[in-house]
Amino acid sequence: MDIYNFKTLLEKIQGDGMKFMKIRTRFAPSPTGYMHIGNLRTALYGYLIAKKDDGDFILRIEDTDQAREVAGAIDVIYQTLSDTGLEYDEGPDKDGGYGPYIQSQRLEIYQKYAHELVKLNGAHYCFCNQENVKGNKEDQIFKDPCHQLSDEEIEKLLSENKPYVIRQTIKQGQTTFNDEVYGEITVDNDTLDEGVLLKSDGYPTYNFANIIDDHLMSITHVVRGNEYLASTPKYNIIYQTFNWEIPTYIHVPPVMKDEQHKLSKRNGDASYQDLIKQGYLNEAVINYIALLGWAPEGEEEIFSLSELIKNFDIKRISKAPAIFDLDKLKWMNGLYLRNLTLENFHQLAMPYYQKIITRDVDLLELSQVLQLRISYLNEIPEMIDFINEPCNADETLFKNKKMKTNPENSLEALIWVRDALSTFDNFNDDLALHDLFINLAQEKEVKNGRIMYPVRVALTFKSFTPGGAVEIAHILGKNESLKRIDLAIRLLSMK
């Protein structure tokens, strides 16, 4: 019994008797760039499955495709898992006794098992060059002529240092496996390609390395995209050849941009890092991603990470593709922003203020206004661009069908307001300022909007603002508010 199987046995034996083996899931990304939404969802589901039953969540770096590796990508993986709270129990920097956890540091292990698989007739040496392979493909299923080589011919080619790969040997018959999402699946073995397991440079392919690692690391539940359903029968044949226990499979549906297209960074779709840069909160992103393919019981959709652990159920993962709805993420992120304390929101908003605002205004009051009105933090710059100076003067902004305003009656209203404000000494009291506008509307026998809307436009020259007339006037102060109202009066008087 090798050390890995011995460790597995020890984990199964607890106290006076046998218990179920501890659940161990893994997240095994390739360091090829930013964290895609689909990859992060795979990590999240693996984490939730493990933690729901007090299991272990393992990080493994699958870097066998050296040509695609991007410098700094491993650090992105570490940072993303840290920021999202998906703390792994074992990984490259947390040895749990199953390492190394980086595939490029496990080459001798893969080579050993590849050659052992050959001895078990589950794989064979292939000496074909690329042209032979292309020429022998039929309907994308490679028929390897090296099957016909005798043991003597193989030994001769090996002794001559003829370059080779090790390919899987697939015998006739059928392979059946069970998936927790898609149920029982049976395939004819003659539809399976005898793919390369070990390349001529000694590196394994993903299709081989993931099997060896999952077994040796005692992974009990494998979470991955449903694009791997087609390869799973080949994996199971290898498990069976080695007489290894097959893990529980959870294949999850793809995350789609729309009904026809998958999310793709190549096509400009947002990665996790992009969303964070746009001002979405980690907690909101994780909450939303959890719902991409999983439906909780009941109507509740807002879950903390600990609540997700408690409520997550594999049986409620859908087979259908999940559509990434940015509008819903905005809505959810807005809820998370509004649930922050004012102080915490203010801290998040301060970097935006520091880049834009030069006028001396009460920034905490500005945060109080903004917190109720934005969906994500990158909306802040457009919301506050009027603070230093009003935006480009445009008299058409004063026309509003709902408020029944136009440039002519807006001019009239602003003159009323200008006269009332000039003798108003309680500008620091926003309630008193509100009453001033309301009383003025009553005095002039007009609707409140006939006063409030022209004032709001005059103070900002924007059709959409973070607050109403009272809030904006209070933030700008009396002198600046009067200055801007005078500017609007001059503009409207020029007609």
Task: Please give the residue ranges for each predicted region.
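Glycine- and acidic
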Residues: T25-P31, I58-D63, M217-V222, I438, ...
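Catalytic adenosine-cofactor/nucleotide-binding cores of aminoacyl-tRNA synthetases and other
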Residues: F242-F398, M403-K404, T460-K495
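Helix-rich, typically C-terminal accessory recognition domains appended to large enzymatic cores
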Residues: D429-L476, E480
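Long, amphipathic alpha-helical coiled-coil segments characteristic
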Residues: K401-L431, D435-F437
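Active-site cores that bind ATP or allylic diphosphates and position pyrophosphate for catalysis
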Residues: E116-K119, A123-H251, M256-L263, S271, ...
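N-terminal Rossmann-like or analogous alpha/beta NTP/dinucleotide-binding catalytic cores
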Residues: D2-E138, T232-W244
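Acidic, glycine-rich active-site loops and adjacent beta-strand->loop/helix elements
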Residues: I61-D65, N226-E227, M256, L329
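Residue-level signal for inorganic ion chemistry
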Residues: G17, G46, I77, L117, ...
